[in-house]
Amino acid sequence: MIIYLISLLPIIVATLMLYQRWWRSNIPPGPKPKFLLGNLHQMKPLWTHSFSEWSETYGPIISVWIGSQLTVVVSSSDLARQVLRDKDHQLSNRHRIARMTQTGTDLVWSDYSPHYVKLRKLCTLELFSLKSIENFRSLREMEARSMVVSILKDLMSNSGDDQERKPVIVRKYLAAVVLNTISRLMIGKEFGSEEGKEFKAIVEKEHLLSGSGTILDHVWWLKWVSSWFFSDKEFLAHKDRRTKWFRGAIMVEEDIEIEDHRGFVRKLLVLKEQKELSEETVGGLVWNMLTAGADTTAVVIEWAMAEMIKCPTVQEKAQQELDSVVGSERLMTESDIPILPYLQCVVKEALRLHPSTPLMLPHKASETVWVGGYKVPKGATVYVNVQAIGRDPANWINPYEFRPERFLQEETDVKGRDFRVLPFGSGRRMCPAAQLSMNLMTLVMGNLLHCFSWSSPVPGERIDMSENPGLLCNMRTPLQALALPRAAARAIPLPLD
């Protein structure tokens, strides 16, 4: 028997080699991988930059081996259309890392399935329909006003006897206004200061752990010796910390009577009581909304403000429009957005040049398909390089120039219909909160420009426009700027503490 099995071994090995050769045949070109590591040793911390450089060599569709996982990256609008529209059904699953993605029971990381459709429909009806967005409009406007008041109060407290103007950290106010808006939308209240600080600390730790586990999650044989590189105890402690925060800040809502419908979480808890959703799904869905909604919106606004400090003529043009349309006796509201075309273009230009997720979240092929004349095997990961497409000279004149006027010359949809600019994705996996995000970004940015003039703390000093590695495209150095109150801000009565 043993001799018989040994005699079959060469046949088995040859069969496996032939299958592997067939499986790899006709896949897109790309850098030559190394045994076991694939191309991981060649990857820069900013993956999108590596993919863009390889695309210049091998073409707009490439194969990259992330450890043992085949990854196909597309970097042109035409190929993005094929992935997100023409082959959307076959490429709507998610490639996910088990430790960091809620095991696929949430909305963001679940495969395309009846479960996903159910969660998306629930979120759309309760949070992201036009009716829901309009119902919560006053909430967003109140938070924008609170942001302006907070900046004014800090400017007053920061000015010493010499009346020297001190810079403000823009991210501080963006993080607060967006998180407060999302939390009130989700649970009907703002987080307390300690809850907010703990939430931010947990998110930062999660990004750090995700980065430290990258190689382990893609190279199967390293998992055998994972204790050399990564502490599972550290991750488990982080998971417990996140669960504790979630139960304290969110699930305490279970103590409220079911009839008290305050926020989206109340609806989820009703479904949990009815056994339609598990606690894990509720937790994952709420975490999706809090982290994705808060982080992605604030990131884009910070980049836009940095660009307008670099290019003051854009800032002045947006302010002139606001002064003409809104005046100086009141703050801008969401009802003003349709009659502020240049401000809308500023937001679109920021989304084009600085999408919050430069690599669209990874898709996974549920069956073998052909894209751009190449085979994408079943099980392959597929990335759309959104940043590269938004900066493609084939699509845009002077693509690295921040020039909102380009959107005045041509009506461009940024919510999934125009494949030259895809900040929210497209197709079945498109971000369901695209319209809400656009409204909030435009409102916050409009109030920042209407109420303050922004400039560099040191005249002539270059702003650090480098990017921080990670899933989100944060500015590596938080933006600091001088804020000079304008007429609209001076019309706001400050509350007495």
From Swiss-Prot:
Gene Ontology CC annotations of this record: membrane
Keywords for the protein's UniProt record, in alphabetical order: Heme, Iron, Membrane, Metal-binding, Monooxygenase, Oxidoreductase, Transmembrane, Transmembrane helix
Organism domain of life: Eukaryota
Alphabetical list of InterPro entries matching this protein: Cyt_P450, Cyt_P450_CS, Cyt_P450_E_grp-I, Cyt_P450_sf
Main location, first listed in the record: membrane
Subcellular location: Membrane
Cofactor(s) required, per the database record: heme
Paired cysteines (S-S): none
EC top class named in words: oxidoreductase
Topology of the protein relative to the lipid bilayer: Single-pass membrane protein
Binding locations of heme: C431
Purpose: Acts redundantly with CYP98A9 as tricoumaroylspermidine meta-hydroxylase. Also catalyzes the meta-hydroxylation of the three triferuloylspermidine phenolic rings. Unable to use 5-O-(4-coumaroyl) D-quinate or 5-O-(4-coumaroyl) shikimate as substrates.
Family designation: Belongs to the cytochrome P450 family.
Name used for this protein in its record: Cytochrome P450 98A8
Species the sequence originates in: Arabidopsis thaliana (Mouse-ear cress)
